[in-house]
């Protein structure tokens, strides 16, 4: 088991609370180590269910009970309604289910905390990957208060719409999840195009493979590599081209807008 000490500059971040923060593979501390890949960095973040059915998101979308989107606490990563320019992959901590979803709202807690950025707008004394609310709740950052001076009652750094929370990840309670900020990656991307419903993500390049999760309509997904598999007819035509979009995650090109019907990623 590897142990990580979270450092800002030359001082342990946890000195803010008079302790040294340790992060291990078994215990979630201040921030899990980032995993850099062609699809962006991944951080372990505490997620809460957004709810708020009938209300409007920061981009003007009216929330429904089976919506598939996420909220992040900064407008710097807010997609326009109907767009997935900023999208994330959210996975259960045990990696058994993932969803690819657009960022359509701002929150929880803060609105200027782009904690995934190396040049974060707020709480610059915290390391990349650590939400200010998480540091406030767990380590007493800013006196245990958010950037609006409210007492922080949970360490959330992402909100999940009800459909993402329940159908996408199969969660029953707020939980720690792995979040990949897909716009940070260097891989080619494709836009999920459906009639509004979610697209099944499979464990391999055919519909007979087990379902590994969901991809929301408009989500922008990384195209890590391709293979030829089952012929599928979808919103973009008929093809046997499939893309790997994450570890054990595959979708058919029949539901992707990539700008061409040819493969745009290397062979797997």
Tell me what each language-model feature is.
Residues 34-203, 228:
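Secreted/periplasmic proteins
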Residues 98-102, 176, 214, 220, ...:
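Well-ordered beta-strand positions in beta-sheet-rich domains
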Residues 216-260:
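SH3/SH3-like beta-barrel superfamily modules
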Residues 260-268:
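Short, low-complexity, Pro/Ser/Thr/Gly-rich segments in the mature regions of secreted, periplasmic
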Residues 204-220:
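SH3/SH3-like (including bacterial SH3b) beta-barrel domains
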Residues 4, 24, 106, 204, ...:
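Small disulfide-bonded, cysteine-rich extracellular recognition modules and tandem repeats
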Residues 1-36:
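Secretory targeting and sorting signals
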Residues 82-84, 207-209, 237-239:
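Residues that act as N-cap/strand-start positions at coil-to-secondary-structure junctions
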């Amino acid at each position: 088991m590897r142990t990580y000490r979270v450092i800002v500059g030359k001082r342990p971040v946890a000195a803010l609370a008079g302790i040294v923060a340790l992060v291990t593979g078994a215990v979630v501390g201040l921030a899990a180590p980032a995993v850099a890949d062609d699809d962006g960095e991944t951080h372990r973040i505490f997620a809460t269910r957004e709810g708020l059915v009938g209300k409007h998101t920061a981009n003007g979308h009216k929330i429904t009970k089976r919506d598939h989107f996420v909220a992040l606490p900064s407008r710097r990563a807010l997609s326009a309604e109907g767009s997935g320019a900023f999208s994330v992959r959210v996975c259960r901590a045990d990696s058994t289910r993932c969803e690819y979803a657009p960022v359509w709202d701002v929150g929880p807690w803060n609105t200027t905390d782009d904690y995934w950025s190396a040049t974060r707008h707020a709480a610059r004394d915290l390391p990349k990957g650590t939400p200010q609310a998480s540091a406030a709740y767990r380590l007493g950052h800013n006196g245990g208060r958010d950037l609006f001076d409210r007492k922080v009652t949970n360490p959330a750094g992402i909100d999940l719409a009800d459909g993402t929370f329940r159908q996408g990840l199969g969660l029953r309670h707020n939980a720690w999840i792995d979040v990949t900020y897909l716009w940070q990656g260097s891989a080619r991307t494709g836009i999920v195009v459906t009639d509004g419903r979610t697209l099944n993500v499979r464990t391999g390049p055919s519909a007979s493979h087990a379902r590994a999760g969901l991809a929301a309509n408009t989500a922008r997904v990384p195209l890590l590599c391709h293979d030829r598999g089952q012929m599928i007819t979808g919103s973009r035509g008929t093809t046997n081209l499939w893309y790997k979009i994450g570890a054990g995650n595959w979708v058919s090109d029949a539901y992707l807008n990539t700008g061409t019907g040819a493969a745009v990623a290397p062979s797997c």
